[in-house]
């Protein structure tokens, strides 16, 4: 047999001299359901970075606002201003999103949207409709569960201008960042180690608990949010698409915002809105 010369050898044959077909199969090694490039430690780093950023930026925004815009105003009163809350929230989202990208692209040199399986789905309107259907279905639970009559979150809707700003966040940056962390980072790490069922459950659980302060630690409201998390994570698992779970989340929040705006005459009479769960 004539030896293969370097002049005639293809690049692939030099890089991979042994064909994959020659390698013996591994029947006892099933393919991983999820195999993200990042690890659980990376997810913990993102979580820690989020807490640190929340603490630092909220303080900076409050002191900056008192110095530049509201001189002499009590910090406790400033903390209740929706505009400042939204500003700090926007800055937190931007910082955390940048850190997420640095973890994926800087550490693993993989495109961010590919690594988290964004995979924008073709059936967008159906997923938005699924979110709306989920809202009407879960809304029935308020007749069987103890729901709070007054929540810290609803107080942010006291003025129409603030309500519209919050509604905008509720259908854009809010669900985007929550889906990126919970369904983009946390779920695939859990599913790889524990399987799909446990991955869905353990992703939805902290998703629900995270919203406890917004609803006065009422377990009925937290249970509803937990179920929203279950549905969104199940969609992510079934379609292998964070974009799909994002659309379901937007459909849920968006339907609720539209209904609330209609019932309250443009957020002017919030007492007619009923119970709001985002």
Predicted segments, located by residue:
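N-terminal, membrane-interfacial amphipathic/helix-forming hydrophobic leader that caps
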Residues: 1-115, 139, 143, 257-278
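Helix-boundary and loop/linker segments of multi-pass membrane transporters
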Residues: 35-39, 75-78, 117-121, 154-162, ...
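Residue-level signature of transmembrane alpha-helical entry/exit and packing/kink sites
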Residues: 38-47, 81-90, 123-127, 162-167, ...
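Alpha-helix capping and helix-coil boundary motifs
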Residues: 71-74, 107-111, 123-126, 159, ...
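Generic signal for short, ordered secondary-structure residues
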Residues: 74, 94-95, 120, 160, ...
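Interfacial segments of alpha-helical transmembrane regions
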Residues: 115-133
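Transmembrane helix-loop-helix hairpins at the membrane interface
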Residues: 133-278
């Amino acid at each position: 047999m004539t030896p293969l010369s370097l002049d005639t050898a293809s690049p692939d044959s030099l890089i991979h001299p042994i064909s994959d077909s020659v390698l013996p199969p591994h029947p006892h090694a099933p393919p991983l359901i999820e195999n993200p490039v990042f690890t659980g430690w990376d997810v913990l780093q993102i979580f820690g970075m989020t807490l640190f950023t929340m603490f630092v930026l909220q303080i900076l925004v409050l002191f900056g606002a008192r110095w530049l815009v509201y001189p002499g105003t009590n910090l406790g009163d400033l903390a209740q201003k929706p505009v400042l809350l939204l500003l700090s929230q926007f800055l937190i989202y931007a910082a955390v999103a940048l850190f997420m990208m640095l973890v994926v692209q800087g550490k693993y040199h993989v495109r961010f949207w590919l690594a988290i399986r964004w995979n924008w789905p073709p059936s967008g309107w159906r997923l938005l409709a699924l979110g709306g259907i989920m809202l009407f279905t879960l809304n029935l639970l308020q007749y069987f569960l103890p729901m709070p009559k007054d929540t810290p979150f609803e107080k942010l809707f006291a003025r129409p201008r603030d309500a519209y700003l919050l509604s905008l966040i509720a259908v854009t940056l809010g669900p985007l960042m929550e889906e990126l962390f919970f369904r983009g980072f946390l779920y695939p790490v859990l599913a790889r180690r524990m399987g799909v069922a446990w991955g869905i459950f353990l992703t939805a659980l902290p998703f629900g608990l995270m919203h406890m302060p917004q609803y006065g630690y009422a377990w009925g409201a937290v249970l509803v949010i937990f179920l929203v998390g279950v549905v969104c994570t199940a969609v992510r698992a079934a379609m292998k698409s964070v974009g799909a779970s994002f659309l379901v989340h937007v459909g849920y929040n968006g339907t609720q915002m539209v209904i609330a705006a209609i019932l309250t005459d443009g957020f002017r009479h919030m007492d007619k809105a009923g119970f709001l769960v985002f």
